[in-house]
Amino acid sequence: DGIRDKLVTGVQTCALPIYAVAGKVYVNLQDLNRFAVIDTATDAVEAEIALPGCRTNHGMALDAKGRRAFIACEGNNVLVVLDLEKRQIIAQFETGRGSDFVEYDAGLRRIYVPCGDGTMTIVQQDDADHYRPLETFPVSRGVHTVAVDPTTHRVYVAEQSVDGRPAARISVYEAVTP
């Protein structure tokens, strides 16, 4: 309760990135290589979904309209696409090493995965069930976060170092549009 500054309820999980959409909360159970779905009406875990082929699921983005979760697997450098209705992985792509964060541009239907090895992988969503790798290109080493402006489709990448020296810089990339 934000007005009373009081915890109303809690759900026991050990989790990273959490997204709430349409009465559900989606959670990466990183240490278990699983994905949880929590029902907000009951505050109970509705499902735990195994993520075969994904180790140390960390970053996550959602396509709420298409009912897909895009999950970066830090332990084996892949991105998996999870069908939230069927509760199964429908696609998998290699990424650079150290994939951490994921961002989804719903307008261009692109998934961005910055990686600590100094690369960013981009996957194109042709429709909810079909995906293809667009490219992996160089960015600064150690990048972890990315944001996409849904209007301009510019991609913002936070950099921790430049030319091997500590820095706090945001690089801006223009998305190539069809």
Task: Set out the residue ranges of the language-model regions.
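Blade-level signature of beta-propeller repeat domains, shared across WD40, Kelch, NHL, RCC1
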Residues: 144-178
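Structural motif
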Residues: 34-36, 78-80, 119-123, 164-174
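Beta-rich, blade/repeat-based domains predominating
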Residues: 11, 15-28, 32, 52-68, ...
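Short loop/turn segments immediately following the C-termini of beta-strands
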Residues: 30, 74, 116, 160-162
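Short loop/turn segments that connect beta-strands within beta-propeller blades
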Residues: 39-43, 83-87, 125-129, 175-177
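Single conserved hydrophobic/aromatic residue that forms the stacking wall/gate
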Residues: 1-14
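A short beta-strand motif characteristic of beta-propeller blades
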Residues: 11, 44-50, 88-93, 132-137
